[in-house]
């Protein structure tokens, strides 16, 4: 009989991990094993190499583009104003791209790019100022999103809606600590149901969470994101416990919401619901070291498996349960059944692959270091891939992680909900330089070629969303990193200009 993949021994899992890591090393538009993996001719490589029903889109999120006008405070508002030093340029999303007023201009950019879909998020505090239904619904916020969704549909663009993209209403943080409390599960589910009721007749793709790993580790592991909690942080915290609590409550909120949608709305609204996870891949620093091979596997389990294992198998990875012990919450049998299989599709945000090497036990308990792995982008001074201002990117890792998920997580229907690269802007970049973003063209083209290869390998991928539609507020980096295919003047956000990458993507999709 076949052994369920969830029950494989650690040794077999490590072997599978290394086999995937050492194969599919090269990607190009023809999927042939030759260097370089990047696209030599971006004019020849276009969407015709993908299935006709494959979805191409662009992505943003509410806090990063809308501005704070006409909505109640969320955690990012409070955090950036109380701790401006946490952001390099001491900025906030108070104005950002002013998409609250300029949403029609946003749709024009999407239309010009020839995309079929737009991934956006709803600002929880814009529709529920008090964070919960009993505090009342802001009908102006509902109207804003109705107008945006209707504008998208009128232009033939399918909305993919993220319900929660890290912007917890500040009232819920103040009242009970946000995702530290199980109380948020009910409030989140009620909020999600409001969205299903008001927008579900037109929205057919729902994403419950964006990268729950990031909220847990950055918000509660090192305090670099709201609410700024960690061991030793001004606001207090416990980096060895709270990230696991927050992750657990996010999973329960997701699962309860999916159950509700499936029972009450899916049949007559005809939509799908899933979630988006961080899609980071890892390679052993020393490919001949068994310790480093195991470290790469642990890194995946602590970054991705932390959430994907419960969603597919109903429990946390074995290695996490062994290493974290009673600091890792347990699912009750009922919770396990609720979480298991709570995906119509998987959203994956892929940006980087890192080298992993075995590390000694940390001196202080922290979810960020519990895996006992040291990560980096260089081996003997040589970068793993292409050096960019924001990080080092490695497109073949894209193919590798998709194959690993195919082989170990039942090959779920998958959408690449984010992929891209940033340019650094410290206020000294000319407009001409900003618009000539040929490096971004190379980034997207090379990743798309590797994605095409992964699909030929049998990976069940149905869509790709470029991050981002336009330059925006990049959370902990403020306005110093620009990921957009369209340039934005942040002192006058109505001033937007198409970058070379935007023109390239438009041509890529026009074929």
Curated annotation (Swiss-Prot):
Which reaction(s) are listed as its catalytic activity? a thioglucoside + H2O = a sugar + a thiol; Hydrolysis of terminal, non-reducing beta-D-glucosyl residues with release of beta-D-glucose
Which cysteines bridge via disulfide bonds? 31-450, 39-445, 230-233
Entry keyword annotation includes Hydrolase: yes
Instruction: Give the stretches traversing the membrane.
Output: none
- InterPro entries given for it? Glyco_hydro_1, Glyco_hydro_1_AS, Glyco_hydro_1_N_CS, Glycoside_hydrolase_SF
Keyword Nucleus carried by entry: no
- Annotated GO MF terms: beta-glucosidase activity; thioglucosidase activity
Task: Write down the Gene3D superfamilies for this protein, in alphabetical order.
Answer: Glycosidases (3.20.20.80)
Please list the residues that make up the active site.
Answer: 418
Expressed in which tissues: Specifically expressed in roots.
Q: Report the enzyme's class at the first EC level.
A: hydrolase
Q: Where does a beta-D-glucoside bind?
A: 64, 165, 210-211, 351, 418, 467, 474-475, 483
User: Where in the sequence is the signal peptide annotated?
Assistant: 1-23
Ordered alphabetically, the record's keywords are: Disulfide bond, Glycoprotein, Glycosidase, Hydrolase, Signal
GO BP, sorted A to Z: carbohydrate metabolic process; glucosinolate metabolic process
What PANTHER family does its record include? GLYCOSYL HYDROLASE (PTHR10353), MYROSINASE 4-RELATED (PTHR10353:SF301)
Instruction: Report the function annotation for this chain.
Output: Hydrolyzes sinigrin and, with lower efficiency, p-nitrophenyl beta-D-glucoside.
Print the miscellaneous field.
It seems that the absence of a catalytic proton donor in plant myrosinases is not impairing the hydrolysis of glucosinolates.
Tell me which family the UniProt entry assigns to this protein: Belongs to the glycosyl hydrolase 1 family.
Task: Return the protein name.
Answer: Myrosinase 4
Q: What is the lineage of its organism?
A: Eukaryota, Viridiplantae, Streptophyta, Embryophyta, Tracheophyta
